[in-house]
Amino acid sequence: MEDLIKHQYSVGVLCRNIGIYMGLSSKEIELLETAAFFHDIGKLFVPKSLLNKKEPLSIEEFELVKMHSLYGAELLKKIGFDSTVVSAIRHHHERYDGRGYPDGLRGEKIPLFSRIIAAADAYDVMTTGRIYKKPLPHDKAIEELIRYSGTQFDPEVVKIFLKMFKEEKAYV
């Protein structure tokens, strides 16, 4: 649980910085940061045994883990969060090439906040590691963002991300 909170906080800070760099309004930055802080809240409804599993997940197990974006979006919708936040959470695992989930959205059809969260989320996961994977150094994580720009990640978001790090304004 503590790791989830740290992760959501780090992703929130990164997203806030990206939003500032992109020139988003203060209201948009607030909504983006809120979505980022809650992007993985749906994992509370996924068995811990799956989230903490060291071995590769079976197809069925992965399908259960993938549900976290839907669970999170539904929860926040029910308690009255802004629809922009709900949508960002639902779609934060969509891929720029359309091969993500839950809806297989592609390119600009993916909400901007989801595209920003996807890059920040991946960077944080890569640099902090997981129970099943060792952390990468900053430079290697950046290489991975570049490598998957245009397939997994929005190329424009990656460009902003790189510029931001180059100017050393994003470290959390």
Q: What does each of the following model-derived ranges do?
A:
Residues 1-172:
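Histidine- and acidic-residue-rich, metal-dependent catalytic cores
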